[in-house]
Amino acid sequence: MDGHERWLERCSKLGTTFPARRYNEGTRTSEDAALQLGCDVAHIAKSIVFEGPESPVIVITSGANRVDRKRKLKRLLGFKPSMAQAEYVQQQTGYAPGGVPPFGHLLPCTMVMDEDLFQYESVWGAAGCAETVFSVTPSELQRITGALVGDVKQ
């Protein structure tokens, strides 16, 4: 089972479905996804995985932003998460970097969402692999993930 099939299965368990688009050219980076979709990179909801003291921390942020983990994320969470290595990302989420979706992870994760995403009617997130994306409203994304919303950008 590939990452996209795994994500579809987990969506089903959550009682939700999202049509996904597949691009053979890849959507591994926010820039790649925006190019394939023909949208601004800010409309990409990238999922960045960090190591927390007890569980992974996933920050869903605008593709145009970088996460300020040393100051803003630390203020929101009460600790500064560490950068995660690819092996950790795969083991904790069930997905490879570049395809980590904002929900449907293997293990429970602490979720944080960039407040900047709420300025858009819809955003695009990875759908389990580096070739698939799906569209969702920011409010629906926050509802599904239960993410803490805040200012996380540098």
Regions found by a protein language model. Name each.
Residues 1-154:
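Extended, low-hydrophobicity, polar/charged segments
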